[in-house]
Amino acid sequence: MTLSGQSSIKQRPLVIGLVAGETSGDILGAGLIRALKQMHPNIRFVGVAGPLMQAEGCEAWYEMEELAVMGIVEVLERLPRLLKIRKDLTQRFTQLKPDVFVGIDAPDFNITLEGRLKQKGLKTIHYVSPSVWAWRQKRVF
């Protein structure tokens, strides 16, 4: 023990697993990475990331664009690849055992992944930006 009460044994840096599947998630994820790096400079981020998250230091196992699908036809065309990615991520995160997994928005992909990781004993968080549904002017006020 040191005088500050901290153990002098070297601890591994925090490891955070992240998955963002769209541009809005990349923006949120980059901000999260920046904020956490201020508190923990040696923190490590791994997972599925876009260019902004990668610029902040996230190691991308897959590019965010691989998850960005819209419409039933595109989803069906890419479903085998999406399922393979989710299976691979489940295995990789389970093996790595990050301190926490953060699914950033993209609920169609992340909610199932988060459930599987929880079953494996990992801590998970689903991180989304608040949204306002104001389709009519009177809902804004």
From Swiss-Prot:
Q: Name one GO cellular component term.
A: membrane
Q: Which pathway, metabolic or otherwise, does it act in? A: Glycolipid biosynthesis; lipid IV(A) biosynthesis; lipid IV(A) from (3R)-3-hydroxytetradecanoyl-[acyl-carrier-protein] and UDP-N-acetyl-alpha-D-glucosamine: step 5/6
Superkingdom, taxonomy of origin: Bacteria
| Record keywords, A-Z | Glycosyltransferase, Lipid A biosynthesis, Lipid biosynthesis, Lipid metabolism, Transferase
GO terms of molecular function: lipid-A-disaccharide synthase activity; phospholipid binding
User: Is Lipid biosynthesis set as a keyword in this record?
Assistant: yes
* EC number(s) per entry: 2.4.1.182
- Where does the record locate the signal sequence feature? none
Instruction: Please provide an example of a Pfam family that matches this protein in its UniProt record.
Output: LpxB
Please write the reaction equations for the catalytic activity of this protein: 2-N,3-O-bis[(3R)-3-hydroxytetradecanoyl]-alpha-D-glucosaminyl 1-phosphate + UDP-2-N,3-O-bis[(3R)-3-hydroxytetradecanoyl]-alpha-D-glucosamine = lipid A disaccharide (E. coli) + UDP + H(+); a lipid X + a UDP-2-N,3-O-bis[(3R)-3-hydroxyacyl]-alpha-D-glucosamine = a lipid A disaccharide + UDP + H(+)
> Per the UniProt entry, what are the Gene Ontology biological process annotations, in alphabetical order?
lipid A biosynthetic process
Family per UniProt?
Belongs to the LpxB family.
**Role played:** Condensation of UDP-2,3-diacylglucosamine and 2,3-diacylglucosamine-1-phosphate to form lipid A disaccharide, a precursor of lipid A, a phosphorylated glycolipid that anchors the lipopolysaccharide to the outer membrane of the cell.
Q: Which PANTHER family match?
A: LIPID-A-DISACCHARIDE SYNTHASE, LIPID-A-DISACCHARIDE SYNTHASE, MITOCHONDRIAL-RELATED
Supply the NCBIfam families for this chain: lpxB (TIGR00215)
What this protein is called in its record is Lipid-A-disaccharide synthase
From which source organism is this entry? Proteus mirabilis
What is the name of the gene encoding this protein?
Answer: lpxB
